[in-house]
């Protein structure tokens, strides 16, 4: 892999390739002038997977991995739930520590709980929190194959007549199985001005600290990138909407750009 220095930052780029293994849908707002009820997201007329969708899927994979492999032995490695406490559902609140209940998540958003000496969770360290950037910049993935958006029709069955309900025909857009999306992800390895190095505690944080990196557990930078970024991104099994209807299966590969 080739590292590039940009404005006192050492950055490594990776090509992210997503291949659809099932019909695939990333939703956009409905155009009031169109008959399509659930359009596919496009940018400049090209179907895309937004960076926010990919980042959310990576975060979910990281959370699951941390909970299954580290959280019980090292509470500092428990992920947060990335939302303010007031926005958490009762079920989500049951996942955080309370009195004698340990919880699998450490609490609500790290950014919301900011303050001098507050510990930042691994997912926010990598992907950012409110008021603090992370080390990974997720790309938009653009359709890079000959496939095109196709229209899919859906309906609802009338339980009384056992026929299609009147007015229930709906049109959505999807990409077929086998389509390929590509984009370029950037990983910050070193920031000379801030004195940040990926995989090490950051030194300038008055409002946060990287407690999970200050204990006995240590990773080399290449091992850190592989375990917490590349392997987790390639472990994403599904993405997008309509998953319960057979959509969203994907295969992601990441290679040095």
Map each language-model feature to its residues.
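RNA-binding basic/glycine-rich loop and surface signature characteristic of RAMP-family CRISPR effectors
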Residues: 1-157, 162-257
């Amino acid at each position: 892999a080739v590292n590039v220095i940009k404005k006192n930052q050492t950055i490594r780029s990776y090509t992210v390739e997503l291949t659809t293994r099932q019909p695939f849908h990333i939703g956009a707002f409905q155009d009031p002038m169109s008959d399509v009820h659930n359009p596919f997201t496009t940018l400049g007329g090209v179907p895309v997977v937004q960076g926010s969708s990919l980042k959310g899927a990576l975060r979910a994979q990281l959370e699951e991995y941390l909970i299954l492999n580290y959280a019980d032995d090292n509470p500092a490695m428990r992920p947060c739930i990335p939302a303010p406490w007031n926005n958490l559902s009762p079920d989500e609140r049951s996942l955080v520590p309370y009195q004698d209940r340990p919880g699998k998540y450490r609490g609500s958003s790290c950014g919301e709980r900011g303050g001098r000496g507050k510990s930042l969770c691994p997912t926010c360290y990598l992907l950012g929190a409110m008021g603090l950037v992370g080390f990974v910049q997720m790309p938009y993935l653009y359709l890079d194959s000959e496939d095109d958006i196709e229209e899919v029709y859906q309906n609802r069955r009338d339980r009384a007549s056992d026929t299609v309900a009147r007015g229930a025909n709906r049109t959505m857009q999807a990409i077929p199985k086998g389509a390929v999306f590509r984009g370029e992800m950037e990983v910050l390895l070193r920031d000379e001005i801030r004195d940040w190095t990926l995989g090490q505690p950051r030194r300038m944080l008055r409002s946060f600290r990287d407690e999970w990196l200050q204990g006995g557990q240590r990773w080399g930078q290449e091992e850190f990138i592989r375990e917490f970024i590349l392997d987790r991104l390639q472990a994403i099994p599904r993405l997008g909407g309509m998953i319960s209807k057979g959509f969203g299966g994907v295969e992601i590969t990441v290679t040095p750009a």
